[in-house]
């Protein structure tokens, strides 16, 4: 199936001369009171930054987690207010989803510099891209997706990420779950596989000569 022309505006990786050996860890669907602190602990242990694509409704519930991740050197990005499929939304609703999430983030942590947007489910449309540009946000997709949300096993998550690791790779992981899976979001062990895999992925990337950064 041919990729729509407008999708060329959504980067799936990031490379530049100065960041030729960088890999970017990103986390969607948080903040979550069980998972996000554990993810932050692993990142702190290995002294690497990441970018967290936060859902605005969760940010309002757990502003302290946004303040913590910013204080620890991570970036917060926009993952909309309620995580809808934006392809089913009219342009006004798309704008509202992005604007309300942005306001929730900066209200939780005025120091947060929100520079990126990731569409829920990775579903991009021309309306979404236009709204992203008007909001001053760079659209970001991914190049490495181990589908950790499906709990495929720690080895699968690690192997998929390492197989896709190359200069500029953007890795998609999760520190929560969408609001329509709210019952799972209350499970303390929701992202245990992601957590264990992350503790293996980071040193493995370093051993391959990659530097891990948050999105530029």
Swiss-Prot record:
Gene: nodB
Key words of the record: Cytoplasm, Hydrolase, Metal-binding, Nodulation, Plasmid
One cellular component term from this protein's GO annotations in UniProt: membrane
Domain NodB homology: 21-213
InterPro entries the UniProt entry points to: Glyco_hydro/deAcase_b/a-brl, NODB_dom, Nodulat_NodB, Polysacc_deacetylase_ArnD
Organism: Rhizobium leguminosarum bv. viciae
Localization annotation: Cytoplasm
EC number: 3.5.1.-
Binding site for a divalent metal cation: 79, 83
Annotated active site: 28 (proton acceptor), 174 (proton donor)
PROSITE patterns for the chain: NODB
Family: Belongs to the polysaccharide deacetylase family.
The protein's name in its UniProt record: Chitooligosaccharide deacetylase
GO biological process: carbohydrate metabolic process
Function of the protein: Is involved in generating a small heat-stable compound (Nod), an acylated oligomer of N-acetylglucosamine, that stimulates mitosis in various plant protoplasts.
